[in-house]
Structures are given as C-alpha cells and as structure tokens.
C-alpha cells in the first residue's frame, strides 16, 4: 500500500456511505493519532485499539444523528499525497470551511489540528481536511 492515510480515509468514507456503525481499520501510529483527533472533535463516537499478531486494528464507532441517520463527517479530503507533499506555515494556514471543519497536520510536535498548530505557531504537512 503506497498511501495508508488515503486508505484510512477511504475506509471511513465507505463505512459512512454504507451506514456502518463500526469499521475496523489496520492500525499504525499515525492512524491512531488521527483517530484520537476525530474522537476529540466529535466526528466519531468512540474507538478502540485491538492488538493482534501483526500490526493491530483500530475499531471505530461511527457517529450518526438519531433523526435522519446523517453522519457527523460530510467530507474527508486527502491533501498531501506521497507524490505531491503539501506543507504550510502557521501564518499561511487557511481555515477549513471558515472554521467549521478541521485540517489535520503532521508537525514536529506530533499530529494535531490546524487550530492547535496556529496556537503553537508551528507549521507542517497538511494531511487532510475533515468537515
């Protein structure tokens, strides 16, 4: 697999379209950090890391509204790709959907949202947009 982040986002996108309540994704440290951010920001209900003989799995409980079963996540968009990396400084960082969405960045201080990176005044690689 050449792009594990794109695979992660695609699995989430497919689970949303199929209205799955739980999705299992192969684990990595970067995917674990992205999952923690999604849970903290309220895009997913819960997550659990399952260890096995290989790399482990992340079990994610998707978040849907009670009324019309609409998911909390509307768009998952990969920005920086293996063939074309996108980096930004904290000064040039734009807000996602005027602050309604989040950008997830990989920085020297770890994986964080665009707001956290702006507060710490550090830039990094823009992994994806979520809104």
From Swiss-Prot:
GO molecular function: rRNA binding; structural constituent of ribosome
Keywords annotated in UniProt: Ribonucleoprotein, Ribosomal protein, RNA-binding, rRNA-binding
SUPFAM superfamilies (alphabetical): Ribosomal protein S8
Gene3D superfamilies according to UniProt: 3.30.1370.30, 3.30.1490.10
Family matches, as Pfam families: Ribosomal_S8
Highest rank taxon of the organism: Bacteria
GO CC, one annotated term: ribosome
Function: One of the primary rRNA binding proteins, it binds directly to 16S rRNA central domain where it helps coordinate assembly of the platform of the 30S subunit.
Designated name of the protein: Small ribosomal subunit protein uS8
Organism whose genome encodes this protein: Azobacteroides pseudotrichonymphae genomovar. CFP2
Origin organism lineage: Bacteria, Pseudomonadati, Bacteroidota, Bacteroidia, Bacteroidales
């Amino acid at each position: 697999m050449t792009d594990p982040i794109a695979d992660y986002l695609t699995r989430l996108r497919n689970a949303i379209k199929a209205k799955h309540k739980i999705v299992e994704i192969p684990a990595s440290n970067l995917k674990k950090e992205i999952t923690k951010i999604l849970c903290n920001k309220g895009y997913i209900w819960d997550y659990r890391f399952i260890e096995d003989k290989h790399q482990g799995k992340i079990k994610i409980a998707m978040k849907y509204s009670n009324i019309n079963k609409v998911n909390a996540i509307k768009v998952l968009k990969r920005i920086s790709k293996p063939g074309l990396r996108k980096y930004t400084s904290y000064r040039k960082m734009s807000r996602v959907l005027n602050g309604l969405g989040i950008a997830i960045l990989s920085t020297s201080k770890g994986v964080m949202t665009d707001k956290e990176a702006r507060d710490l005044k550090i830039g990094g690689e823009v992994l994806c947009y979520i809104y």
